[in-house]
Regions:
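Cap/lid and interdomain-hinge subdomains that line or gate substrate/regulatory clefts
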Residues: 36-41, 63, 67-68, 94, ...
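N-terminal signal-anchor module of multipass membrane proteins
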Residues: 38-61
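Short glycine-rich or small-residue beta-strand-to-loop segments that form or flank ligand, phosphate
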Residues: 39-44, 80-88, 111-122, 233, ...
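Short acidic, glycine/serine/threonine-rich loops at helix termini
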Residues: 53-55, 125-129, 156-165, 214-215, ...
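N-terminal glycine-rich anion-binding loops that anchor highly charged ligand groups
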Residues: 62-83
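Conserved, well-structured core segments that form the ligand-binding/active-site neighborhood
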Residues: 166-329
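C-terminal structural cap/anchor segments
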Residues: 339-390
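Conserved, well-ordered active-site substructure
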Residues: 384-385, 393-442
Length: 451
């Protein structure tokens, strides 16, 4: 079913919405009586990005629970955000994880879905953005897929298909030091084309400067030509608004960076958004866990160490992760409950290089995540109530280790996004921070903010 209802035939997704409506409120229910027809499911490829989106939506007055399990229980909402660990795992597993959320009860009533990679579409030549986009297109029957990378507010942009990171072409930026996704090709159209057999075409910033009608005609031409995916430049805020609006009005799968996904969701739910009272932080002992190696976090740890103790682990020692964590617990014992402290899996880039030489980039990352996951469970058992976690993959390992299924994000504030509190009994507060974001004193300020 591919034609519109104007022709007397419903689309595949309209059929899905009718079935959801009849299952929940019975046949014949009016569209404006059913909030689910306007609901949006946003599936992010890491936990910090998922939380960032949830916080932006909360700041816009839209209740947006964040789930880490496909069947997590959440209150009725206009938008549900899901955090996965799909960025760096094997492509087939990443696709499977996304499908679990598509089919899970947490966002099973959503009528539109967005897959949200990082703002710079961090990935490898083999995936996982292309495979997920192909899967979503196949499941919905919608083609071509729309793709849009960029975050102009923080100087992450795309122009003529090329990715610029903080004002520099990505291969000349600090992004080139990323141990898992260094993005060796700045041409995202060419780079993404390695991840899919369906082809990637470009709608450039120059195209969008010629106006909506020109862009709509180009989309139509590319679609008629059989384009599998259409990539849109996001060079500035005007590009961002236009592509989000075009996606909201289309019947296309959308693969979108943080601010584009937020703009899309706001366009879909409009004035019907469900709002709820803001959450409150939990007071209690705090710990900082750092698994990222970005230069930014090194400066942040240096500022933190001027006030609180910091331990840097050596992942290259012959001990297994449990033994490394046990040694760290001995060091932390005198601090737990008495003062904040931080544990990092490296001191500097040289530590990272040694770990990579010993275990490979993926192996070293998984070793670090395992150690920090063990420590998170131990600290939680000993009464830690506030966790500050740096790094998207690290955040995923800590949240998973703690068995957290759902959180409520706090609206964006003076320190930006990243704050949340778990739902259910015995809550804890968390600050999940992307490794490359924040001022030098953000860890210290976050501690004060979470009181």
């Amino acid at each position: 079913m591919t034609k519109t209802s104007k022709d007397g035939i419903v689309t595949q997704w309209e059929l899905h919405t009718i079935r959801v409506r009849e299952a929940r409120v019975g046949p014949g229910a009016e569209r404006d009586e059913l909030k689910v027809t306007n609901s949006v499911g946003i599936i992010a490829d890491d936990y910090t990005g998922a939380l960032m989106v949830a916080c932006y939506l909360e700041a816009a007055g839209i209740y947006a629970p964040l789930v880490f399990h496909p069947d997590a229980e959440v209150a009725e909402s206009s938008v549900v955000v899901a955090g996965t660990r799909a960025r760096t795992i094997e492509a087939a597993t990443a696709v499977s994880n996304v499908v679990e959320f598509l089919d899970g009860s947490a966002m099973g009533g959503s009528s539109r879905f967005v897959y949200k990679p990082s703002a710079s579409f961090d990935s490898t030549p083999s995936g996982n953005i292309g495979p997920v986009a192909d899967c979503l297109a196949q499941r919905t029957g919608w083609a071509p897929t729309f793709m849009a990378a960029g975050f102009p507010e923080v100087a992450i942009t795309t122009h003529l298909g090329y990715l610029f990171y903080r004002g520099k072409i990505v291969t000349a930026s600090i992004k080139r030091f990323d141990p898992l996704t260094p993005m060796p090709d700045p041409d995202l159209v060419r780079f993404l084309s390695q991840q899919t057999d369906r082809g990637v075409e470009l709608v450039s910033h120059l195209d969008m400067c010629r106006g909506r009608r020109f862009v709509e005609n180009k989309i139509s031409a590319l679609s008629s030509k059989g384009a599998g995916h259409i990539f849109f430049d996001v060079s500035d805020e005007a590009d961002l608004r236009l592509v989000a609006d075009l996606a909201a009005r289309s019947k296309s799968v959308f693969i979108a960076s943080d601010p584009v996904a937020v703009a899309f969701a706001k366009n879909i739910v409009g004035n019907s958004a469900i709002a709820r009272a803001a959450p409150r932080h939990v007071s209690g002992p705090a710990a900082v866990l750092v698994g990222t190696v970005a230069p930014v976090i090194q400066r942040q740890l240096a500022a933190f160490s001027e006030v609180h103790p910091v331990l840097a682990l050596d992942l290259t020692q012959s001990k297994n992760p449990e033994a490394i964590a046990s040694d760290a617990m001995e060091w932390a014992a005198e601090h737990v409950g008495s003062r904040p402290f931080a544990i990092a899996t490296s001191r500097d880039q040289s530590d990272v290089e040694r770990a990579h030489a010993a275990y490979g980039s993926i192996g070293a990352a998984r070793r670090a995540e395992e150690v920090l996951g063990i420590l998170a469970r131990e600290f939680r058992a000993r009464g830690i109530k506030r966790f500050l976690v740096a790094g998207g993959e690290t955040s995923g390992s800590v949240v998973s280790a703690l068995g957290i299924k759902a959180v409520r994000g706090f609206p964006e504030g003076p320190l930006g996004t990243g704050f949340c509190v778990t739902t259910g009994e015995d809550p804890i507060s968390l600050f999940l921070k992307p490794g490359k974001f924040g001022s030098d004193d953000v860890l210290l300020e976050a501690l004060d903010h979470m009181r």
